[in-house]
């Protein structure tokens, strides 16, 4: 499977059986810059704490960098 990986946001091969993920959360600059984003691959969908959103998928390049809605 191929997943986008941060910080370069490039598509890279991940080991067989892994899933791609997009993890987003707010930090101190969330109102100005939007949510922080972490893209990667893992053996299983990571468990996250409250306030962190995660989406996992299992097809090539299914985790593109999320677009931010403009006001």
Swiss-Prot record:
Q: Which Pfam families match?
A: Toxin_cobra-type
Instruction: Give the main location.
Output: secreted
Extract the GO molecular function terms from the UniProt entry: acetylcholine receptor inhibitor activity; ion channel regulator activity; toxin activity
Provide the disulphide bond pattern.
Answer: 3-20, 14-41, 26-30, 45-56, 57-62
InterPro entries under this entry?
Answer: Snake_3FTx, Snake_toxin-like_sf, Snake_toxin_con_site, Toxin_cobra-type
User: Where is it made, tissue-wise?
Assistant: Expressed by the venom gland.
CDD domains tied to this protein: TFP_snake_toxin
Q: What is this protein called?
A: Long neurotoxin 1
